[in-house]
Regions:
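Alpha/beta-hydrolase fold nucleophile elbow
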Residues: 160-171
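Accessory cap/linker subdomain of secreted extracellular hydrolases
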Residues: 118, 182-296
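Active-site-adjacent alpha-helix of alpha/beta-hydrolase-fold enzymes
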Residues: 313-334
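Glycine-rich nucleophile elbow surrounding the catalytic serine of serine-hydrolase chemistry
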Residues: 170-179
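Cap/lid segment of the alpha/beta-hydrolase catalytic domain
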Residues: 93, 97-156, 349-356, 585
């Protein structure tokens, strides 16, 4: 049977076909009126169609410019010259500026630059110091505040600039924005950092005191390709076998003597050696930590995070910290948060091994960025005029707007650990419930650094070919005897968990130091175990990442493990599961259990780790449970 197209759709097609070129408002109204007169059968159709046409076609009929490209250079305060590409409208007048400072080659910003310039922005993409066409030496984070300040003020003074400068981009490009913002250049008017960190020790290089080995090795190797004119491709390819390294061969990084380090590291990535030399949160890190400088940020910020991103925890802390401690009312009240499904390299409908439905594919980073600056710089009343927080809720697989983050209505709920025999592997009897434990046995396992628990998915970067990120079936890990498993019964109704997740763990070890890992998992009726979020804590940093404190073997300690955040509806019939172990390799380096620096140690010992869950040691997973509307 032939289906008739709705009147609104036919009208939209006619008007937008006629109005391929920019039209004035009165012309649009006339065309819309005429089309409605032809196709609308009643007043309701007329009103609906006219509203649809005007809202949609006004967007398409916004002034569009031809774009010119030119190359420019600017001198920093110390005399170093940085080079940039400038995309701008071929028109007289002055326009707001959107600036990106990147270590990944300025030619990579073309797609957004052309789109934004055609929409009435001057777009500047600059190679940061020591990268590609810019002069100087690249050293992570060190020059980004001063160079960012100088570049913003140079951009604001260009003859075609109206004096308003915004910044955009993700990962290290997000870091260049944050580090520029804490220097508060007068003409910086907004930033849009995407998937970036808040602390370059505890959310970039380390987590819970453990070294982010996979990210740091793969990212550093990728950066070195430009530094050495891409001749170190063989080093990048070698990463493919990193997880198969001889696990009993030590030391892993023999860099205590710089002459012992590989030449490719000392000459191409000297910062890597410094990261290893500063395992604690000391002044080396504090001077560049965004968390230490929230009060210096004076501009509105759109923070874009992703549930499976390697910097998710830091992105959310940026939003919370600037909203609470920003240096101006405009900053505190101008915070917006957008949390997508996906990982560090982007999103889409299918992430890892999970299909999140058509709504997941709606996110477009370039579109969101442009809307943010249309709202901020041009006063366009778009989605950013509404609630400040927008998140993707997994399980329900839909977007939702919120008043704030974390959600005020989320109820902190303790799910206590239980077992009657032993919770080791899927063959054990570990369980989770809201009932507090009384008298129960302990659970134990042996952690052998030569046989670590392998990383399967999760927040990974930057070599997806060899170590695919995102949600993946965790059953291979859960079959191991050195992984403790605690599960709820199948839920009788949909249960939402949205917000920060943590684990209060009472445990002891036979070693002076070890790691404890935790992973939150959604288990479907078919057994598929989808990882949601995870965390790690190196025992020596249980009190503070600023100072190491070894354990007394056999003594019970309380450990608090930060699993970052999630938003997931555990559907009816699904189970919620917690995995506990002592390694997640090669995402994190292995703790050798000796108390030595893992990067330099030559020996290792196995550790027998014991988890307590009784009345005196109520180990519990703390979840933000959200009641349905």
């Amino acid at each position: 049977m032939r289906r008739e197209m709705p009147a609104e759709n036919r009208i939209w097609g006619i008007v937008c076909f006629i109005s391929k070129k920019p039209l004035k408002l009165d012309t649009l109204v006339t065309l819309s009126h005429e089309a409605c007169a032809m196709f609308c059968r009643n007043t309701a159709h007329y009103a609906a169609a006219l509203g649809l046409i005007l809202s949609t076609c006004l967007l398409h009929a916004a002034q569009s410019y031809e774009v010119s490209l030119e190359h420019a250079s600017t001198r920093m305060r110390d005399g170093v010259t940085l080079r940039a590409d400038i995309y701008r409208p071929k028109a007289d007048g002055q326009f707001p500026v959107l600036l990106q400072r990147t270590p990944y080659n300025k030619s990579g910003g073309v797609t957004f630059a052309l789109k934004a310039a055609a929409s009435g922005y001057v777009v500047i993409v600059q190679d940061v110091r020591g990268r590609y066409t810019s002069e100087g030496d690249f050293y992570t984070f060190a020059h980004e505040s001063d160079d960012g300040y100088d570049t913003v003020e140079w951009a604001a003074a260009l003859p075609y600039s109206n004096g308003k400068v915004g910044m955009w981009g993700g990962s290290y490009v997000g870091a260049t924005q944050m580090l520029t913002a804490i220097a508060h250049p007068p003409h910086l008017a907004g930033i849009c950092p995407v998937v970036t960190a808040s602390n370059y020790h505890e959310n970039w290089t380390y987590q819970g005191g453990a070294f982010e080995q996979w990210f740091n090795q793969s990212w550093t190797s990728a950066l070195a390709q430009d530094t050495f004119d891409r001749s170190v491709q063989k080093n990048t390819n070698a990463l493919g076998g990193a997880w198969k390294l001889p696990l009993a061969s030590y030391p892993l990084f023999n860099f205590s003597d710089p002459s012992a380090a590989p030449a490719s590291t000392t000459t191409l990535a000297p910062y890597f050696l410094d990261w290893l030399a500063h395992p604690t949160y000391d002044q080396y890190w504090k001077q560049i930590s965004i968390e230490e400088h929230f009060g210096d940020i004076n501009v509105p910020v759109l923070t874009v995070a992703a549930w499976y991103d390697i910097f998710q925890g830091g992105s959310l802390r940026n939003y919370i910290g600037i909203k609470a401690h920003g240096g101006s009312e405009a900053a505190r009240k101008g915070q917006h948060l957008f949390v997508t499904i996906g990982g560090h390299a982007g999103g889409g409908r299918k992430i890892g091994e999970v299909d999140f439905g058509p709504a997941a594919a709606e996110y477009d980073e370039n579109d969101v960025t442009l809307k943010w600056y249309d709202y901020l710089f041009k006063g366009v009343q778009n989605e950013f005029a509404g609630k400040p927080v927008k998140i993707f809720v997994m399980g329900a697989n839909q977007w939702r707007e919120e008043d704030d983050w974390p959600l005020a209505r989320a109820r902190s709920t303790k799910y206590f650990l239980h077992s009657s025999k032993n919770a080791a592997s899927l063959r054990g009897d570990g369980s989770l419930s809201t009932a507090a434990p009384r008298t129960e046995t302990t659970d134990h396992y042996v952690y052998d650094p030569a046989n670590p628990v392998p990383t399967i998915g999760g927040p990974l970067c930057c070599d997806g070919q060899h170590m695919p990120p995102g949600p993946r079936d965790q059953r291979p890990v859960e079959a191991r005897d050195d992984v403790l498993i605690y599960s709820t019964p199948a839920f009788a109704q949909d249960t939402e968990v949205t917000g920060p997740v943590s684990l209060e763990l009472f445990a002891k070890s036979s070693a002076v130091d070890t790691d404890f890992t935790a992973k939150l998992v959604d288990v479907g009726p078919d057994g598929f175990a989808q990882n949601l979020t995870e965390g790690i804590l190196r025992a020596r940093y249980r009190d503070s990442v600023e100072k190491a404190s070894l354990m007394n073997p056999g003594q019970v300690y309380k450990f608090t493990i930060d699993l970052w955040s999630t938003s997931n509806v555990f559907l009816k019939g699904h189970m919620l599961r917690l995995e506990i172990s002592s390694s997640n390799f090669p995402r994190f380096d292995r703790n050798l259990n000796t108390g030595e620096d893992p990067a330099l140690a030559r020996n290792f010992v196995s550790a027998t780790n014991t988890v307590y869950h009784d009345a005196d040691h109520p180990s519990a997973l703390i979840l933000p449970v959200v009641q349905s509307h």
